[in-house]
Amino acid sequence: MLDKLLRLGEGRMVKRLKKVADYVNTLSDDVEKLSDAELRAKTDEFRKRIDGGEDLDDLLPEAFAVAREAAWRVLSQRHFDVQVMGGAALHFGNVAEMKTGEGKTLTCVLPAYLNALSGKGVHVVTVNDYLAKRDAEWMGRVHRFLGLDVGVILSGLTPDERRAAYHADITYGTNNEFGFDYLRDNMAHRLEDRVQRGHNFAVVDEVDSILIDEARTPLIISGPADAASNWYSEFARLAPLMEKDVHYEVDLRKRTVGVHEVGVEFVEDQLGIENLYEAANSPLVSYLNNALKAKELFQRDKDYIVRNGEVLIVDEFTGRVLLGRRYNEGMHQAIEAKEHVEIKAENQTLATITLQNYFRLYDKLAGMTGTAQTEAAELHEIYKLGVVPIPTNRDMIRQDQTDLIYKTEEAKFIAVVDDVYERYEKGQPVLIGTTSVERSEYLSKQFTKRKIPHNVLNAKYHEQEANIIAEAGRLGAITVATNMAGRGTDIVLGGNVDFLADKRLREQGLDPIETPEEYEAAWESTLNQIKAEAEEEADDVRAVGGLYVLGTERHESRRIDNQLRGRSGRQGDPGESRFYLSLGDELMRRFNGATLEALLTRLNLPDDVPIEAKMVTRAIKSAQTQVEQQNFEVRKNVLKYDEVMNQQRKVIYEERRRILEGEDLAEQAHKMLVDVVTAYVNGATAEGYAEDWDLEQLWTALKQLYPVGIDYHDLVDSDAVGEAGELTREELLDMLIKDAERAYAERERELEELAGEGAMRQLERNVLLNVIDRKWREHLYEMDYLKEGIGLRAMAQRDPLVEYQREGYDMFVGMLEALKEESVGFLFNVTVEAAPPAPSNRVAPVAAPPGLSEFAAAAAKAQEQTGQGAVATKERETPAPTLRAKGIDNDDTPPLTYVGPGEDGTAEVQRSNGGPRHAAPGGATRRERREAARKQAKTSKPTRRRG
């Protein structure tokens, strides 16, 4: 029903877009008459009009006409009307559903150019580094021709290179790179260390893959937490002793394990504990679950391999060994324990955000894909994105044959090889889609036996994938590919002309970035030569039926099946597709496999005779719909839990931004001082009369905070108050606040004598930034711990999400109170010394970042220069003093670990060498780590100054 409601306005939107395209066409004649210089000058003209108040929507027809003409002159490619319609849909903040081969990459040029004119930046998001680099070079030629800067964000770039790329008018990159840069910016200790400049407009290529498939895995930056626990090994010993369906049950569909009461008793007996689920033992539940998952759900040589004593993850879809990546939440350690290899330490979360919440930061979001209709409801519900199906430039004449279902996998693959051999004999190109590297290698062996030449895409490098895919439409080409491999490159009958022309020019030593003038000069003649060769071959391919797409298994998502089919029949070309299935396929086993097997048994058909039945097709569609719904629920659940963190993250990141931008924090520091003293007094005077108050204990606590100038004995005995019973809470609080303000003013004078005027403001920034970061990390750790055990609340008939929201809020409020107390203590008690100012224009070394106080000093200097929140100081030409606060700075730089979604949506892990300065406290279990963290917090609390 929701799908139908969402599609009600589609027709009206398409008509509106058609009118836009028609209007752009009326401007084409005038634009074509312009010289190259005049066309380029249009960019400056548009910018002036925007500065004058003209709206981007009003500029759209002219800007699109200019960009279309530039693409024709630079790439010899002119946008079709449907591409102009797609570009307009993107500008209006929609998902443009454009079939494979309709030119989504070229379509993106139009809205990217228009929105870049505002000067606020445009981000074009792709699924991998190769596509980001390719599109930045390829489409960047058009933008550079029109006078715009184009940047690309790739893994491995330095911060300076990233900053330059973000300050370009249009920036290409992957979702993970954009997201991690956002998180790193909010861990930076100097304003100039940030690289992004805002979130204006993003166009997401393959939007279904990025916003849906990959949205189950949040982006996480983490650092080392502790040494590995011996509990992993202990539970790895217990797991083989436990029996499936006796001690525990396994749900393959949801990839979960559930421990029965018998299993709990078994573990309790083995460990010699009375109650596994009591608070002191609750961390052990996580070790048990991970050990059982490692045993039942993670298979060696399928999900991972063991090489040189190390557990390496294998990408199920592409078959790549994911070097340097690890499962999170203790899962990787559980597998290491199972395989008896070295167990490496867990990581502690330092910063995290979901892709859903990252992309909702943008003022305007748009996306392109060939297959979005099946997820229109989710895109609307989570991102408020409408899906607009763009008509094809030419009618699609591909023939989609019905599925063939075999009883066994062996019979299925024999039939596949026979079918491919027949097609190869007549020269028809074939693309065979598999769901895993294991099956693609098996098929490759069968083809080799039959002497069928072929290419296999178990690619380790996207560039090699693209090379093979670009030639997969040539006469007699047989290509075996996993479903996710080679996306972003068209399979063009006769070969991809642009790709082949670029390849030939690069072979001649020409490059669009390194040698742009020579590259452009040779482009047109090379392109024409390739075109003639390819068109002749394309006619031969059309004569034998076009590209034949053969799927060897249904994917759990209909969208992936449609993507595979969509490889064939582009731009009105002939084509054909068919899926070969068996009862041994993963999807069939998970849903209704037994029913179908019983049916085939009753029919008494031989193994090599397939069936074609609507009932089977319906069963498959039902199974896929169920999986899609389950995955949607997982993504919604991830978002609901992250929404709690998102509100808290906004508060912390906004506070950090204010500090980095040099805002005067004197008023905030004063408020914190008053709040902390008030909290101390409230705690001491909460119950009873004045004579019952333990003023000695209150004074002891206050002396740990600041140098108290009042003796409570004098206070009680003074004539002003009289007897102790006459002392009111308000009088006590008023006296102590005035005393604390006196002490703070004295502290400020001391620092100014030591390091000059403005020194206290500098220390406030230094301390606040340090304490916020440390408390936020501790809070993330506590929230991780809370979320890990919150599911158990369901056993008490409580909604885990509601409990998480309530307790998470309470913990956040508690963290803010602790932040105030610790900040005030440091401001009074930290030992400060003046350091000589750094020479101007000095370049900081890359390997070792300066201490926190130097960071704050730099921020203070920047603040003085900009005049924002300036402190009243005497004019002077000498450099601002630099403070060094002992006990705050810590120059340790443990390696950072980045966890984000891979192209198939599963978590992937990467490491770097630099990181934040504070590692988490050590300990064997999470509970032990918490205790260690608390002890460390206590010992690191500031003590009273002496002297």
Swiss-Prot record:
Localization per Swiss-Prot or TrEMBL: Cell membrane; Cytoplasm
Reactions that this protein is recorded to catalyse: ATP + H2O + cellular proteinSide 1 = ADP + phosphate + cellular proteinSide 2
Enzyme class: translocase
Molecular functions per Gene Ontology: ATP binding; protein-exporting ATPase activity
UniProt superkingdom: Bacteria
Extent of Basic and acidic residues compositional bias: 925-934
Gene3D superfamilies for the chain: Helical scaffold and wing domains of SecA, P-loop containing nucleotide triphosphate hydrolases, SecA, preprotein cross-linking domain
Pfam name, any one: SecA_DEAD
Compositionally skewed regions (Basic residues) per UniProt: 935-947
CDD domains noted in UniProt: DEXDc_SecA, SF2_C_secA
GO CC annotations on file: cell envelope Sec protein transport complex; cytosol; plasma membrane
Keyword ATP-binding among UniProt keywords: yes
Start and end residues of each stretch annotated as Disordered: 860-947
Record-linked PANTHER family: CHLOROPLAST PROTEIN-TRANSPORTING ATPASE (PTHR30612:SF0), SECA INNER MEMBRANE COMPONENT OF SEC PROTEIN SECRETION SYSTEM (PTHR30612)
HAMAP family: SecA (MF_01382)
Quaternary structure and interacting proteins, as annotated: Monomer and homodimer. Part of the essential Sec protein translocation apparatus which comprises SecA, SecYEG and auxiliary proteins SecDF. Other proteins may also be involved.
Record-given protein name: Protein translocase subunit SecA 1
Organism field: Mycobacterium sp. (strain JLS)
